[in-house]
């Protein structure tokens, strides 16, 4: 059973939730062999109805104490561009698609996704581009994220937010 896990973190990202459960996106996931989609929707107002039909299951929840189990079971992670969610997924060695919130484009999240993509660790897109990216991406091209280098990440974030030149 191939599983895709979607996380929006502690905030809301209704556009992402709606995009992922749209019929065309679900059909693309099915065509790629995914038959289980798990959504962590945070405090969003879009609340898809969970269902299970042969051969596809959709599970939905707002929060859990830890996402560790969902990340471990995931064959693909689709995440908002929050630094914590990105790093946790990458450190677990999971293929990652980061969806940048177009309403927050003037923040560090876009820069982080862009840099980690440039280094070959993830794919990124906006909500409207997600179906096309899912169809065209080659997960085998992703490079493993080197674990245990928080100082490198911290320095990058400092530079992005203007604390360091």
Swiss-Prot record:
Instruction: Name the pathway.
Output: Protein modification; protein glycosylation
- UniProt keyword Nucleus, yes or no: no
Write out the GO biological process terms.
Answer: dolichol-linked oligosaccharide biosynthetic process; negative regulation of TORC1 signaling; protein N-linked glycosylation; regulation of synaptic plasticity
GO molecular function annotation: N-acetylglucosaminyldiphosphodolichol N-acetylglucosaminyltransferase activity
Q: Which UniProt keywords apply?
A: Endoplasmic reticulum, Glycosyltransferase, Membrane, Transferase
Q: What is its main location?
A: endoplasmic reticulum
Listed EC numbers: 2.4.1.141
Compartment(s) of residence: Endoplasmic reticulum membrane
How does this protein lie in the membrane?
Peripheral membrane protein
Domain of life, source organism: Eukaryota
Q: Function of this protein?
A: Catalytic subunit of the UDP-N-acetylglucosamine transferase complex that operates in the biosynthetic pathway of dolichol-linked oligosaccharides, the glycan precursors employed in protein asparagine (N)-glycosylation. The assembly of dolichol-linked oligosaccharides begins on the cytosolic side of the endoplasmic reticulum membrane and finishes in its lumen. The sequential addition of sugars to dolichol pyrophosphate produces dolichol-linked oligosaccharides containing fourteen sugars, including two GlcNAcs, nine mannoses and three glucoses.
Indicate the family of this protein. Answer: Belongs to the glycosyltransferase 28 family.
Q: Relate the assembly described in the record.
A: Forms with ALG14 the active heterodimeric UDP-N-acetylglucosamine transferase complex.
* Name this protein carries in UniProt: UDP-N-acetylglucosamine transferase subunit ALG13
Q: Which gene encodes it?
A: Alg13
């Amino acid at each position: 059973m191939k599983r895709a896990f979607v996380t929006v973190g502690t905030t809301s990202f209704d556009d992402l939730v709606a995009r992922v459960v749209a019929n065309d996106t679900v059909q693309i996931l099915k065509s790629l062999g995914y038959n289980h989609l798990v959504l962590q929707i945070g405090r969003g107002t879009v609340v898809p109805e969970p269902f299970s039909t042969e051969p596809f299951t959709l599970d939905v929840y707002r929060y859990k104490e830890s996402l560790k189990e969902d990340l471990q079971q995931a064959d693909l992670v689709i995440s908002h561009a929050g630094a914590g969610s990105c790093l946790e997924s990458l450190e677990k060695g999971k293929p990652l698609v980061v969806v940048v919130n177009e309403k927050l484009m003037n923040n560090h999240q876009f820069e982080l996704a862009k840099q980690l993509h440039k280094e070959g660790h993830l794919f990124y897109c906006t909500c409207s581009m997600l179906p096309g990216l899912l169809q065209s991406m080659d997960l085998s091209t992703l490079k493993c994220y080197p674990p245990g280098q928080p100082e490198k990440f911290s320095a990058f974030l400092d530079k992005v937010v203007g604390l360091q030149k």
